[in-house]
Amino acid sequence: MRTRFLPLLGAAVLLIAGCGQTKQDVFHPEGTNADKINTLQVPVFIAAGVVGVIVAVMLGYVMVAGRRRAANDERDPEQLHGNFKAEITWTLIPALILLFVAVPTVTTMLDISSTPKDAISIDVYGQQWWWSYEYHLSGNESTPADIVTANELVIPVDTDIHLRVQSRDVIHSFWIPALNGTRDAVPGRIQPLEIRADKVGEYDGQCKEFCGLSHANMRARAVVLSKDDYEKWVEANKADAATPAAGTDAAAGLAVFKAKCSSCHQINGVDQVEGKSALVSKHAPNLTHLMDRKVFASAQFPLWVPNADGKLEFNRNQLEAWLRDPPALLAMAPDQKRGMPNLALSEDDIDKLVSYLETLGPIPSNAIPPSGS
């Protein structure tokens, strides 16, 4: 009974792995290059399935026809060695099949790898365990980025985007299946990836290369806006963060940020207590417009949650839980040298810090303003 159960269990695992109704589905492309990949892979999968069935049938036939009929039957089955027609047939047919697959594969790879003119250039940095996006709006990658954000790649619809995928620590792999294939993020190398989204929407992805304890939690997310909304997003995200009024909880939270957070995080327009610019270590996400994002912490947790009326409400409790003890929510390196450590913030410091962070707008268009902002 057990020997019968194990093959069934293995088959069930394979069938479950093939379910394509998740958000990360390569068979429902929403981008030009992803559609080209799907156009290539479907006939290849069909051809592979047909070949697999033919091989299985032939193997079954040989096993049945060539078996020994009795225990004392010493005769060998009929041998085909030296049969010129048979050997030419089973050599040429696989060669033609490989040619049938290779030609469109090579042409598709060359097509999706070409960089269109006037594409928006964005540097994509992978690091344990989140993605950073740096926008070069002028197209000159040698100049400082105009916009630096994290966790959400915001792009306009029907526009060519040139991604320069890189890593600041170990090897990662950037993948948003609805828009294109995967591209490894390798330290010291710049890997190009071209995307173009056909529809306004939000598309999920993830790191596809094992990169440490929280690899499974290293999400990627693309937010595709209309061209008008994208221009508004650009103008808003080019601005520095506003300074909170003196004597407010937000101002007290800014002081906590400078004392506890500014060695890793950056907020444009914020100076350290000594008057020097906050360290641009890039070890942690740029928080200048945190409230404009719908997710945080490796895009793992929602920063905004829908209420019964369909409006978005600030997820203050989740953000406070994250600040209270990050390693309790996401696996980090045991020596706290990777990921966000537990800073041992007091509850009063957490309240003040969140009061400041919720001022880092703008907020999503259908969101209810946080009570403290």
Predicted features along the sequence, with ranges:
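Bacterial N-terminal signal peptides that target proteins for export
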Residues: 1-6
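Alpha-helical transmembrane segments
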Residues: 41-67
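Hydrophobic aliphatic residues
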Residues: 290-291, 323, 357
